[in-house]
Amino acid sequence: MSAKAISEQTGKELLYKYICTTSAIQNRFKYARVTPDTDWARLLQDHPWLLSQSLVVKPDQLIKRRGKLGLIGVNLTLDGVKSWLKPRLGQEATVGKATGFLKNFLIEPFVPHTQEEEFYVCIYATREGDYVLFHHEGGVDVGDVDAKAQKLLVGVDEKLNPEDIKKHLLVHAPEDKKEILASFISGLFNFYEDLYFTYLEINPLVVTKDGVYVLDLAAKVDATADYICKVKWGDIEFPPPFGREAYPEEAYIADLDAKSGASLKLTLLNPKGRIWTMVAGGGASVVYSDTICDLGGVNELANYGEYSGAPSEQQTYDYAKTILSLMTREKHPDGKILIIGGSIANFTNVAATFKGIVRAIRDYQGPLKEHEVTIFVRRGGPNYQEGLRVMGEVGKTTGIPIHVFGTETHMTAIVGMALGHRPIPNQPPTAAHTANFLLNASGSTSTPAPSRTASFSESRTDEVAPAKKAKPAMLQGKSATLFSRHTKAIVWGMQTRAVQGMLDFDYVCSRDEPSVAAMVYPFTGDHKQKFYWGHKEILIPVFKNMADAMKKHPEVDVLINFASLRSAYDSTMETMNYAQIRTIAIIAEGIPEALTRKLIKKADQKGVTIIGPATVGGIKPGCFKIGNTGGMLDNILASKLYRPGSVAYVSRSGGMSNELNNIISRTTDGVYEGVAIGGDRYPGSTFMDHVLRYQDTAGVKMIVVLGEIGGTEEYKICRGVTEGRITKPVVCWCIGTCAAMFSSEVQFGHAGACANQASETAVAKNQALKEAGVFVPRSFDELGEIIQSVYEDLVARGVIVPAQEVPPPTVPMDYSWARELGLIRKPASFMTSICDERGQELIYAGMPITEVFKEEMGIGGVLGLLWFQKRLPKYSCQFIEMCLMVTADHGPAVSGAHNTIICARAGKDLVSSLTSGLLTIGDRFGGALDAAAKMFSKAFDSGIIPMEFVNKMKKEGKLIMGIGHRVKSINNPDMRVQILKDYVRQHFPATPLLDYALEVEKITTSKKPNLILNVDGLIGVAFVDMLRHCGSFTREEADEYIDIGALNGIFVLGRSMGFIGHYLDQKRLKQGLYRHPWDDISYVLPEHMSM
């Protein structure tokens, strides 16, 4: 959502910090917060003025008309404040229909004043600009300010100066206070603009001879402007409306939402309720809540929420487990219902999101059965068949009753089933699988001939425009036709999947050439990107610079902007500098409303139509589609969006626009054009803009509008119909009717879906539309029936002529999508069994990285997982780490370290220097671990005694690997060997090979004291003992790891630490290029050459 209410304390804190005015504002920062946990001694220490001044106390919990409700204590001493708070603090209170606990109060200095010194000031945002209201009689009895106050509209990008304030607002204000008031209101407006407020009311504003006092303040800020205002706002809190508690689960989901590109929302309405929802889509979530309330479930509705924007499997798992946890805390005598609903997704992989929900259901299967939960599922969109399949499977395997439905079932039908208002079908009809649409040959089956318009052309010569004359449909310069079969677009953003979807749509519509001419992506250089046009591969240019793209593609008149919310404004502003662009679609959600209004103003000046922000876009069947609109090809074909029908629609929601595609295709001859204007409070183009376009488009025979709670745009349709400007039949339904039934305000999924006054409620708008002559169903459940009824009447009157269906061309399926659907298989080029990075978290040999840290497995444990696919005993992990420590380095003189140093001093980088050192490891340097392990193992396993082994090796003239040291001896032992030997003997369950090697050492050292078991030999034999006797490996596995060189890996890994150390050491010491001295080189040349 966008506009969010803040507490009075937060509002005043920001005001006192950042307002700039010549008026003397008194009592700055003089307020004290009191809660049930307040330490009064500490409070007095922080606010000593509490003891010396008369005080005012009031709740700060977004409660309106506190004075009228007797919730303000005035002119009290500190003891009086405490007495006043005693029966109220922490107690339950009822305000209107809402009941809640009073637990947050504000104490401020009492300001003695007269009624004549009280004024009313309010600033609030609208599409056209910001209204400033002023009334010279403020206070508790101010009354209907809309009717009484002086009002001034400050247009977008305009400034409010003191002279205008005096002239238009301060007409009835006392002369001696006009200057102070003008300065304060001017500063207040600038403060309101700079900190992205959407509503700011002060009542009363008191002006005395001492200065200005802000007594009571109410405010809302645009929460989407957080990235702009973070420095000034700080960590701002948004309290829930009075009567609704702030639950930790709501905060948890809000935190998930903030960290995700997807949208995740949760509001708890009644935690003891019986009916729970988990709905995909901002618009769909409102429709489901409406239907539940319409069918009498308002008192049992437990939550409102939605997930959308393609959340990952892990995100939907976290969201689902939160809801399942909440609904299984308290039992209900009638059991509970979970509605997992949603419209037809445009781009969300339904199977992926459902797999997250299925995981959560499996985890909570015990509590779900215990609480007698029945689950109803309805969804459509990409890969939805697989999603429904896994959902049905989990019902069978867990024994939880789960009823699963797809696009063949009306979206809200499951609500009626869940509440017992309609029967649950035993075998619901199943929609065709994706492959059936995409892989069948065009002529393989006979094509039915449903009703549709007689011609595929955009307009027919025998069509007659409406007879009634009226003002032009669009603002001057804006075209009634946005898209045609020849429309060309530029896509801003590296959205290859969306572009391929547009090209597939173009191909199935039999367009002559692709609709995407170029892409703009400022983060790479100019290049070309490969796409498919049917079977062929084509290249589409990608430009770093928008100017280059526009210059090289003058035929383009549409820009589809996939820029993020932070850059969408700037990129759209830049786009409007090019006269060739007539339509811009802004996909991003979360653009601050103040910036959107600037976009709208410039678009109106330039004659540009903006669709969005916060939209999936729009579609004109047979001609053009924006980005992901209409979903994947299976939905395009199922909803017959490859050719035009007779019905045009406009909605706010992208998901609901796809649902309308489905409803319209099932009840009429199909869609002529459909636009989702976006869920923000100020969409770039309005319902009326598009309705008037449709009215003036000959091919459109009827219009469908899916309105929404919030705003007043739908009333313009009422006026258009009553004044005769709109003559075509209009079917309209405004979603959000349930809002009137809730005791406290609910902000629905879309930023604009919140009524600020009675006229903005869905109920009021539906009633007005009906009275104006618009076809209005009784509920969304009946929308399809009304559309069908109006359509059939038009067919009966001959307005729409049935025509033969023409099959679309076959489009090849993408390989990656076909593989995901399980339609094809191909041998993988690579196989891996140790690590999987594809999911929400990294997995080492089946163990999530979080578990690795939780179990404190350390480097040895991780090495065990990655090298051996085993979770090794703790002593084995410790032994591996000790091996890495003792092999880490052996000074700069050894060949590997020497090479590393030479390379580093030659100016090479770390990787080159490290590699040069590692390349010296072999039989002569570092390779003795493997050789020692193999040699001792072979001797031990063959059954020969140590003396026989020594004699045999001597006879064959071979060295015993792992025996001998240049410096160390039996009299000067190697401490590395001693440490490891002690550890192994103390912790290993058995050490037969180590014992054998030590017996060999006794024989060799009796001949020469430096023929000791060295560190390579000890690690080699001890490692074999570990593999064979730790219990994690079979004998075959242990032998295989020795054969494939696992032991050399220990030396390579350990010594890499030392080599890197030598590299960093040389760089730190700033050593220059090394040249070996001549006197250390013996030049031995052939005699005849030296002569």
From Swiss-Prot:
Entry PTM: Phosphorylated by PKA and GSK3 in a sequential manner; phosphorylation results in activation of its activity. Phosphorylation on Thr-447 and Ser-451 depends on the phosphorylation state of Ser-455. Phosphorylation on Ser-455 is decreased by prior phosphorylation on the other 2 residues. Phosphorylated at Ser-455 by BCKDK and dephosphorylated by protein phosphatase PPM1K. ISGylated.
Modification Phosphoserine, positions: 263, 451, 455, 459, 653, 829, 1090
Cell compartments where the protein resides: Cytoplasm, Cytosol
Means of activity regulation: Phosphorylation results in activation of its activity. Glucose 6-phosphate, fructose 6-phosphate, fructose 2,6-bisphosphate, ribulose 5-phosphate, and fructose 1,6-bisphosphate also act as activators.
UniProt cross-references to Pfam families, sorted A to Z: Citrate_bind, Citrate_synt, Citrate_synth_N, CoA_binding, Ligase_CoA
Catalysis performed (reactions): oxaloacetate + acetyl-CoA + ADP + phosphate = citrate + ATP + CoA
Residues the record lists as binding Mg(2+): 257, 260, 262
Record-level GO BP terms: acetyl-CoA biosynthetic process; citrate metabolic process; fatty acid biosynthetic process; lipid biosynthetic process
CDD domains: CCL_ACL-C
UniProt xrefs under SUPFAM superfamilies: Citrate synthase, Glutathione synthetase ATP-binding domain-like, NAD(P)-binding Rossmann-fold domains, Succinyl-CoA synthetase domains
Cross-link Glycyl lysine isopeptide (Lys-Gly) (interchain with G-Cter in ubiquitin), where in sequence: 530, 536, 544
Domain ATP-grasp: 4-265
Residues modified to N6-acetyllysine: 530, 536, 544, 938, 958, 968, 1067
Family: In the N-terminal section; belongs to the succinate/malate CoA ligase beta subunit family. In the C-terminal section; belongs to the succinate/malate CoA ligase alpha subunit family.
UniProt protein name: ATP-citrate synthase
Gene: ACLY
